[in-house]
């Protein structure tokens, strides 16, 4: 399957990482001698099934990455505007949406993720990483986890969507994206009974998927057991230190 990718790279470096780098954009913060965003761009550029990459952010900070395959798209006002701009620019039936701060994702990891997405036949695929695997791969790294019947999980930093399905379900998708780092808030959108089951750690993935499908009329799929590297994004100094240590070896 051929598809286009969207990389979100417009965040200004005025948050938790401001003291770690003078770069105006977080995407350009140095990790092991390279700008952070270059890692995911290299992965996507090497993949034959990715026909175009829409890099969303200010041209003055990102023009160095523009190639025949990578096109710069001016940012909107916030995360949701940027995702919508990217989807509007995509001409393929499906799109891959990625953060720019995921330097540990490799070509092999991305190939596995996309293969599972295509096999699922779903309209919206979201990677879910098991806590035990994350703790084993990256001891001591703090993430937000949610415990359900199948285990304890955290969400990843990319997703796979069928453009037409997401466009018609955008209001709920927007909420889900905004709550991507708060699994409990995400679950709260699914109704009080299911929220209670989540609180009691008795909800199952299939129940959550069925509820989402009824709410927004698209077929979702949570991909359990995603590679732990997908769950590592650089949004605080300890994450930056971890990635510099791993990639600097």
Show where each model-derived region lies.
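Conserved N-terminal catalytic core of the sugar/cofactor nucleotidyltransferase
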Residues: 3-7, 34-94, 107, 201-203
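Short catalytic helix/loop segments, enriched in acidic residues and glycine
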Residues: 21-40
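Conserved active-site beta-strand element of glycosyltransferases/polysaccharide synthases
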Residues: 221-224, 233
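Short, conserved phosphate/pyrophosphate- and ester-handling motifs at nucleotide-, phospho-/glycolipid
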Residues: 236
């Amino acid at each position: 399957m051929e598809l286009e990718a969207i990389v979100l790279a417009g965040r200004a470096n005025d948050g938790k990482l401001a003291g770690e780098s003078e770069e105006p954009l977080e995407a350009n913060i140095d990790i092991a001698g390279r700008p952070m965003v270059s890692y995911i761009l290299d992965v996507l550029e090497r993949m034959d099934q990715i026909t175009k990459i829409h890099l969303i952010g200010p041209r003055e900070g990102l023009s160095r990455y523009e190639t025949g395959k990578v096109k710069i798209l001016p940012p909107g006002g916030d995360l949701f505007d940027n995702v919508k701009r990217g989807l509007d620019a995509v001409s393929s039936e499906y799109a891959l949406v990625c953060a720019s701060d995921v330097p540990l994702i490799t070509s092999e990891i991305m190939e596995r993720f996309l293969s599972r997405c295509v096999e699922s036949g779903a309209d919206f695929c979201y990677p879910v990483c098991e806590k035990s695997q994350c703790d084993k791969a990256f001891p001591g790294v703090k993430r937000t986890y949610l415990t359900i019947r199948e285990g304890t999980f955290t969400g990843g930093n990319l997703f796979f969507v069928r453009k037409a399905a997401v466009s018609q379900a955008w209001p709920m998708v927007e909420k889900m994206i905004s709550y991507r780092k708060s699994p409990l808030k995400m679950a709260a959108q699914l109704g009080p009974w299911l929220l209670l089951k989540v609180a009691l750690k008795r909800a199952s993935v299939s129940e959550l998927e069925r509820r989402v499908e009824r709410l927004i009329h698209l077929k979702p799929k949570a991909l359990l057991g995603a590679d732990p590297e997908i769950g590592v994004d650089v949004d605080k100094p300890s994450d930056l230190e971890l990635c510099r240590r791993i990639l600097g070896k």
